[in-house]
Amino acid sequence: MVYAIVRAGGRQEKVSVGDFVTLNRVPGGAGSTIELPALLLVDGDKVTSAAADLAKVTVTAEILQDLRGPKIVIQKFKNKTGYKKRQGHRQELTKVKITGIK
């Protein structure tokens, strides 16, 4: 089984060909392809982690859609002063399909 650890959207993800991964928003529209930098490559028993070898490895992904994550609510409260603050946030996300590890 071939898989790679890639840096994507500020995080590290374990991916293999055919996987669907949700990342922080990546520039580009639906249908475009992106390349993700590999940090580690595992091909059966062979593990590649040297930077010179990983520079030759490309992990390609196709952007499927841009979406937004679930809403989270942030609340602040100070006792005895009447201070209350409420704020919501929805993270911008991108769903991609890993198309190749070469």
Curated annotation (Swiss-Prot):
InterPro entries to which the protein is assigned, alphabetical: bL21-like, bL21-like_sf, Ribosomal_bL21, Ribosomal_bL21_CS
Family designation: Belongs to the bacterial ribosomal protein bL21 family.
GO cellular component: cytoplasm; ribonucleoprotein complex; ribosome
Protein's job: This protein binds to 23S rRNA in the presence of protein L20.
GO terms assigned for molecular function: rRNA binding; structural constituent of ribosome
Protein species of origin: Arthrobacter sp. (strain FB24)
Swiss-Prot/TrEMBL GO biological process terms: translation
Subunit architecture: Part of the 50S ribosomal subunit. Contacts protein L20.
PROSITE patterns, sorted: RIBOSOMAL_L21
Domain of life: Bacteria
Keywords of the record: Ribonucleoprotein, Ribosomal protein, RNA-binding, rRNA-binding
PANTHER family to which the protein is assigned, alphabetical: 50S RIBOSOMAL PROTEIN L21, LARGE RIBOSOMAL SUBUNIT PROTEIN BL21M
Official protein name in the record: Large ribosomal subunit protein bL21
Keyword Ribosomal protein: yes
